[in-house]
């Protein structure tokens, strides 16, 4: 972690100094010293915030505020310092615009349509429900607590609070390796839908300065929609017929790809600005066109510093803007800020629980999804900033909104760190989401006794192989999963030997109800370390001779599981390497034209067979 922080600091410092060189040459050398001090201070604060498990963007906002206070911006505006700091207002405004464009571009690069197309109906129902209910609630909260006036001010205020942060959602899921979990897919899909809505309204804000009603507004909205659709079509055509071969060539050099990505981003943004379309929306869709290429992971790796650099420019200058406001706008609205922050942090998980209860997701999934998305977004901070500059937000509304957004980042990060403790504290109130069939019902409906049975926790390739083995022996297996789509699939497979049970595999009452201690084999196919340790302890106390097998992707977790009396650990990399060793020994001595051909063909057939057997849920496994 420390190496990553120092590397990012070095890269961003180099970019900052490079950007400041023309200013220095033009007589603006006063900028380099404070810029270096700000970035150095931000590095120290970032290390502290990382230790406190907070988003590092807060460090740049803090240093921006410190810079503004040092300049005395609370008592005088930027224009009053022109004589001593020539061009400062223009330079900071330019830095901010560059930061906004780069953040929007990288948001587009990281935008993955597969996040919503994998479970299109499920994600859309939850995501649209979340955004819709959130807009209604926070529209009311904006008028009730913040005192917004008019439709434009209230709806933009609500939008800025309802859309989750792609930065924080992605970081949280990656840290816990939950990207492919059901709650991770719900959180990511909701963020994707909210981001799309935010970009569309951002384009509307840039085009007309707000949201009006009437016939003229309907015509302008129609024209704006046509412009956005045309922009999307053009960048997608560029992506398919021009970018793909160009990027394939540029991947040979990280420097070429980096410079070309910056040029492409700024070029599309400039063209959109000249045509009257939002440059920010243009940069976002340019990022999508680049991120949709087959080389997405390579592109993200090589142009990743753009994200950090853009965030630094944006949030440093945002801090300066915040310090430019009258301090009384913050102090006089402390109660409003705290109230709205608590509403964001508390109400958004409740909305996920409400929307999640319709497709019958389990309480743990709903709570974890809600805790992951209960913050404002960096993109909506951009909207708030632009709305303030466009006159849609007053100084007071802007001060309230930015304060609420930043406080929601802090509280949300703390909540994500303690998300399992939060769930355990509130799960007693959510029993209505967790009604499970009893062991008696499973025995009655499927003829499966809860003794000497096989238990599979979660469904994936490992459980597929175990189930196939017992199907050949004519035995049924009990498969427990929290994914409603997988459960519905096996409920429809009347001839399958898999008996599906829709339940929370981390709920210890399930272990007793379905008599895990009387099973002949328990296989945990999810790499949930703490749950597997607790289940191992439960089985060791109840039935020490029962074989318990667990799956993990981590070597460290494998050793810890063995230390906690798990009988056998399927460490996927280890198993893959051992399996490949056998294939390697079998194929390597064949002539080059035949080497690995038979094994590859057999692997292709086996994978196709799995896909054909699983049908629609193949992409979910």
Where are these regions (language model features)?
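Transmembrane helical cores of multi-pass secondary ion antiporters/exchangers
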Residues: 1-440, 444-445, 449-450, 454-457, ...
